[in-house]
Amino acid sequence: MMKKMSVRVSGDVRPSKALHLGLWVVQGLLGAMFLAAGAMKATQPIAVLVDTLGWPAAVPAALVRVIGVAELLGGLGLILPAATRVKPMLTPLAGVGLAMVMLLATIFHISHGELGALPIPLVLGGLAAFVAWGRAAKAPIAPR
């Protein structure tokens, strides 16, 4: 038996508590992961990143830094606007942005024959897209 994702209350459809909770859990974990990964790419010496990740050797150092800043901002965007209810429409936009970064990472890894690296950007991109969809369409957060 499947549970419904929403309940009808006097003509209005409200998302279930499970969906809200699931979105918050994904937002928190994904936000923390992108904050850590972004901080690493934005601040660590490129030589350290090459030793750790490998792929930064194949791209300009400036691109590695831009990716790091994008991941930092995206990680913040997944959490802060929704948590503070200040411009909460930025949360689904952060999800879309991070999903795009992960799509580009997937394309990069495929083009470099790094098929073993694909699960991470595919899963993270899917989770970011889930947050974008959930917070834009199914369980938006109302602004203050």
What are the roles of these predicted feature ranges?
Residues 2-144:
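Membrane-interface extramembranous regions
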